């Protein structure tokens, strides 16, 4: 043997009979091969190689064997010798400390080793030890035997053939023998491992298996060294490249055209590959022919295995290649590798993240080696016959740029020359063959699911791998980045994932235990489809949907899937093909993305429209179907399943559904796939979700950063940068989505960009190669990938919307973003997010126990020193929702809460949820107002004192507020005001202290409002800065402003509450007592109270004092309303400033834009001028210069147009943005104002006006939670109580009214006695339900007696009354009434009264007589005398004490001057603290209550009979809509002179009817009906005034058995007459008849009782919400006089805008014993009425009549207007119909005229042709007049002849011509007039000639007419002259033209055309004479104007005409 053969290394290849392909790698002859010893004889002797003179020893590649199968030549794709998983971080190298250098030297005993080292150094730059064949045999001999049992092949099929050294070749394998020297394919590559290194590469999830191969088995055995103990020893590693490779950066499988990696001698590479040959996600592979190979150093044994699965042996029917690098075999059957000399290798191996496990696998000589599988497509061969390769190393690919060698085609095996440049590589023209499927499948891959190995690892894992040389890599296909918007479901799931991880995101700890990476992976999976993260959403989204709707909903649930649907639809429609690449992402709770896509494509496009190559056995079939079937347009493929074996005939689009964090990895995987035809049309479309981590990853890729370095170490800062991108934007959009009322899973938070994306996508696909740049892209971005980085001139979609500050740290960013949010998830997840540790609950969190008083709450770890109410939930979320939303075990940061302030109005119906419309747009304020719920007023139970938590919160807030006041430098007064205001808020509202920012905002806002109240100047901006800096507050200005606006609305209420503390109905601070205990006891016992003299002066003073307090009270409510309006005005001003600022910014941007484009245009103009000057100078030729200048102008015009178009687009876009911003501001303003109005509306209704110390009245169980307080004023002689309702003070003159306020205490257990006083008000007040006003001007000489109702004081309150020691003055007469409370809103209103009674005080008719004032109480007539007050109250509680209804009470009292009577609702409001009591001033002689009546219902009837000088009966009844009417005790005014018996009445009415029935002198009786009150919103407070009456009347006690719902009060005024009174009342119950006691008479003596039957009380106002009156009801009274019914004053106050609605109910005792008074009047049988004149009655009657007349007038005018409208409409319709007919007739006339003109033109053509034939005489030579000239003349004449009307045919028919018919019948046309002044001449077509010639005989000739084809040609005949047709006799014919007279005889005969009567053959045209033609050409016609004068003349025209 030769010397070089002895030194060389020998590689051996083993083939089976079924082998179909050779080693797909070119062999590089770097070292000679080693010959192995004889079979079975181990030897350490170096085997010399074959002859060194082999032609292919160094230059030619090693032989690549091929074999035939099924008649086709199949190439064996070379698996990478160094394969690693896509997730591997490090290459685990098996480093054995065992072994010695002696073992290595044992294999290197050849004396010529030193010469070989030089060759080794040439390629590896280091000395590689040479191993003998014995080393290889020792390694594989026993190992390959064990795999023999796994091979399912017969001995014939497995017969081995030795190739390379020509030892054994099977006889039947001719292909192998004949092609041993064939080079490997051009694109095949291999990797080289150094000597003594064993590389085991395996995927993550699947076991490494050894499979049987029945067809194709290739075994490459590199030399190894066998030691005596059967161990394999490798040489130490000395190349630092080893560490780089072992770091897990380069173990990648090169693509089909990628560079190969050389494995140096001495290393065994064991690698497993899934059929798709997945490649590491982060590996930058190189293209062929451009890259340098990279080699592993000598002495490294690399065993790479993944973490998840054990190393197994499996069977596989594909191909398997085993690469055996030289190792050293020892005697103990172990593989020994020398330790690496570089210790950094071990450090790198150990310091990896643990994603790849270091595995030490002993390679036993007999079994272990054969059990290791390197490629899933190949199997280990059996047998001991190992054929050594001719080379000691695995050949490098031909793609290496230093190799210019012939290659072999992959398909046809033709040898071809390949240069180093892959772009210039020749492509074989052979047709790609289908991929053959394996015939014998022994064991398929797992069919239970797709691949989940490390190559199939979820997309979230970041791969750390380095490419060999990424700087030389560039993409083959153009790539476009396609933006996709998240759907609503994805948006919520994305934000929910971030929200659930808020604790770890905002943490400062650097040890997160993988929480950040887990969050990153979760949000990336969400971007693909929400089902990937949570499969339970499928049930939620598809609930209650039809079957055909489910697919659409699931598609729209993912923005990517929705866009993919559109893209694939377009692709299928246009007959294109696409490959969809996806990442195999899956979670335990979700679905696999591949299955989702497969179901989608199958259902949407049909089962035959796609292929999905998941499994090994089905992948080849799927690819073949995709290539063959025309209907199959989609191929689904996992990104890492791409391999060089996949060959597609055509693919127009590669769609990347999911992306890696390093986008270049996806491109490298995709480019492994080979496109055989039209590959230049293939484009890559990468879908990315905007404003998410996917977009941020692309931004990083575009920033020219090395991606392998950017994502190599996914550190904390990079993870935060990815997660922070777009988070704020998405949370803002989440607020929009949650604010919408109709959730939709589609893209709804912004206008979808899908249409624009699809348009650009279709444009790119339709463009040809090289035209991509011509497509103008706005949404899609073309990314240029070169040298491992991306570059682009455009920005991504989200970069225009997101401005992320780099200065803000991540923890601050997440704290601000997530700290104040508490979203209500619309798509809650059933699987909460996993948490690394259990979070400690903060006190007050949702998980804390809900205790009533908060005292039993377990102590927990606190986040701060704040105290939280344990019952706080905002908004209330049940456990299921909390678990579903992932907030079950979150702390304060995980589940933030919102501070809430809720009013006490529980009846408002709010449920604590945020109204979506109100929350919309608030994020634009710059903070999180949207996080603060709209319902900022929590309901407070007014029946209970504040609970323990609120009191404890108050205790905690006091020192906090004190500290804040100190920091803000507030004065002592302001600090005191802060404490008072805080106390008020705590008592009336519920405050929560979560989240902390809102709680801090509340504190600052409280200090602001306190400073405002004490008028201390406090800068809001400065105070906020101080609080944030000194107290570490983190609240924003917007939050403080919002809460401050709410507190501002409470300012006036707080002031009223503060002032009300000094007014106490039982308070000792009142210097003057009002009620005597003795009098109270007497009142309760039924004793008679003596008449007391009333001092007029004291009454006037008390009236003034009462008026003053009323004004104050109304002022408070008016102030509250003004505060609300002021707050709203401030909001409007604030937004107005923002709008102005926005407009200003818009104008600035617009001007900047215009200036920019103006500059551009100026630059272009300058450039154009310069270029034009250059052209003028350089171009000497004029033509060239002009052409160049024109071209220059054209080019610049196009540029100018482009600039203009671009400017217009930018301006339009700017305007749109401006409009959107303005719209958003308007929506924000409306939202804020609406929320303030809603808050204020509920607050005004339910605001408590409390008296200071009346809390002892809150003991009833029936008390309403919304019952307001009653404020009581005590002055010198008066106790005033005001009903707590809303009224507005108007500035018109006030009408005095009688205010009868009826009320009871809450639950009836306690009642309060109030005194009726005189009140005078000069202002017109809107008085609500239970308020009445009366103005009294009493004179000392007048007498007035007032009957007052009973005073009901419960027994348990008598001690309190006794303790007061109050005394009743003789000058006082007081009525005690009880006010009712209700939880209903006060909706009844009293209309404003415009009449003035300011002169009432001057009237002498209403003077009070103190001596005659006597009130006596009659208890004899009552049926239940024995009941005391307690029994009455108890019975009331049992039967009718309901606070849910309202009782109106009205009383129209007689007043002196004419005025309107204002009736008010008889319902007052009261809460547990007190009641409103309306004083009634009166001149009482005495009073005595009688509680003996039996109360069975809530109705009460009172009769008032004042006596006046006049006599007029007025009956007024009150109504109200009541649900469960409460009882009202109404004080009535009278001037009694005697005692009257108290009648008994059984009243069943449903409303309170207060009827004043004065007797009228005349027979007229006036009935006042029910009428409503004004709207609630116009009333801010109630003015409680009493109207004194100077009338003398009586009031009887009513022992009523009341079954109705309301109180009926009847006031009877005795008059001189005795007219029947018909009262309008309320509807009654089924019992229509009522027993009534006789009404008292106003007479000096006692009168017998009279029975009053009240029947048929009907009130329509109960059911109608807006009504001004009620129907009249009859009140039958037994009296001798006639009965007169008067209609009610139904419309009395309707004109003033009366509106009726639910009012406040009043609960009063039903039994009142009113003292009867004796009045000196004449008795009347049965019911005598005294004579009484009352000016009020006259005024009321007048107003009633005016109202009726007004209504009648209105109806009449309305009917007149309606009739007028109908009449005018009929006239207008008739007029337009007439105009329509005129236009139509005009149109028809014009159409007829046009038709006539058209027919005339046709006729003139015929005549012209006839003249042409006639004028051509035979005398004229044919050559004398050219035919063309004649035709020109004819055309000119045609223009002139069109102006003439032809009438000659009718005239010529009457002549005696031989041919009488001038024209044929079919040619006779209608005539129409032309606008021309003269008739139109004849219109010849060919030419015009004279009408006559010199020879009349010529007229006898017949000529054919040529120019116009006609059914028959016109003939010209000579007509004998007759007198009728001569010019003298017939004016229709004219003489010939003057210039033709020389050619005419003396008697010229006119010509006429006639239709031929006989068939005359047409003849050719001839010309008469040359002179005629010349004359026509030279002379103009002189007689044209004269020839146009006649309609029937034949005109002869000259040539010019």
From Swiss-Prot:
Residues 953-1044 are annotated as: Conserved MOM1 Motif 1 (CMM1). Residues 39-53, 92-102, 1528-1540, 1915-1929 have a biased composition (Polar residues). [2Fe-2S] cluster binds at residues 400, 409, 412, 430. Changing residue 1802 to E: In CMM2-mut3; slightly reduced multimerization and transcriptional gene silencing (TGS) activity. Residues 693-722, 1130-1168, 1194-1217, 1736-1785 form a coiled coil. InterPro entries: MOM1, MOM1_dom, P-loop_NTPase, SNF2/RAD54-like_C. CDD domains: SF2_C_SNF. It is found in: Nucleus. Changing residue 1737 to E: In CMM2-mut2; slightly reduced multimerization and transcriptional gene silencing (TGS) activity. GO terms for cellular component: nucleus. This is Helicase protein MOM1. It comes from Arabidopsis thaliana (Mouse-ear cress).
